[in-house]
Design a protein with these regions (language model features):
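Helix-turn-helix
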Residues: 8, 12-50
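Amphipathic alpha-helical segments used for helix-helix packing
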Residues: 91-118
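Hydrophobic alpha-helical connector segments
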Residues: 54, 68-97, 137, 147-150
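N-terminal intrinsically disordered/low-complexity leader segments
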Residues: 1-4, 185-186
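Generic hydrophobic, amphipathic alpha-helix propensity
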Residues: 5-13, 30, 55-59, 63, ...
C-alpha cells in the first residue's frame, strides 16, 4: 500500500501499464485511478517516461530484494532453483498474467538506445549476473554460459505463460534447469 502520493502514482501506473500497456495508458487515466492531482504528478515526475522508469526501478528493487533474501537463506543450488519457484508464484499470483513488465516495456520502447529499453535490458543483465554469482559460488564450469542458459529457461517460461496462460511453465523450466545443473556436475 502506498505511503505517499509518489508511491501511489507508481503503484497505480504499474498496475495499469502491466494490464493495458505503456502506450495505451495515458496520464489522465493514472491520475483518475490514483486520485492524485496533475500538479503533484509533475512535481515528482517530469514526464510519463520518467514515471515508467520509476515503475521499472521499483519492480526491479522488489525483485532483487526477494532474490537476495532467498540467496541469504538457502545454499546456492537451492537459491538458483528457488528462482523458478518464485517465477511460478508470480505467474499464478496475479489475477491476469500479462507477461514480464520489463519485456513488455522493451517491446513497446524497442529502440535499444531508449532509456526505458535500456532499463529493461539492465534488469535482465542483473538477473544473469545474479545467476552467475550463485554458479560461481558452486564452482560451476563456465558459469557465464550456464547463467545464460538458465536465464533462457526463465525467459521462455515467462513468454510461454504469457502466450498460453498460466500453467506449469516455470516448473517445467525448473526441471530443465536441474538437468542443466546435473550436466554441469552441480
Amino acid at each position: 500500500m502506498a505511503t505517499n502520493k509518489r508511491d501511489q502514482l507508481i503503484e497505480t501506473a504499474e498496475r495499469l501499464f502491466y494490464r493495458e500497456g505503456y502506450h495505451a495508458t495515458g496520464i489522465d487515466r493514472i491520475l483518475a485511478e490514483s486520485g492524485v492531482a496533475k500538479m503533484t504528478l509533475y512535481k515528482h515526475f517530469k514526464s510519463k517516461e520518467e514515471l515508467i522508469l520509476a515503475v521499472l526501478e521499483r519492480r526491479h528493487q522488489l525483485m532483487f530484494e526477494r532474490l537476495r533474501e532467498r540467496a541469504n537463506k538457502l545454499p546456492p543450488r537451492e537459491a538458483l532453483l528457488a528462482v523458478f519457484d518464485g517465477l511460478h508464484t508470480m505467474i499464478h499470483g496475479s489475477e491476469q498474467y500479462c507477461g514480464c513488465l520489463f519485456v513488455n516495456a522493451a517491446a513497446e520502447y524497442h529502440d535499444n538506445e531508449h532509456s526505458i529499453h535500456r532499463r529493461s535490458s539492465a534488469n535482465k543483465a542483473e538477473l544473469q549476473a545474479y545467476l552467475r554469482e550463485l554458479l560461481e559460488r558452486l564452482a560451476a564450469p563456465q558459469p557465464q554460459q550456464l547463467a545464460r542458459q538458465l536465464q533462457y529457461l526463465l525467459e521462455g517460461a515467462l513468454s510461454m505463460a504469457h502466450l498460453e496462460g498460466p500453467g506449469e511453465q516455470a516448473r517445467d523450466a525448473k526441471d530443465a534447469a536441474q538437468v542443466l545443473l546435473k550436466g554441469a556436475g552441480i
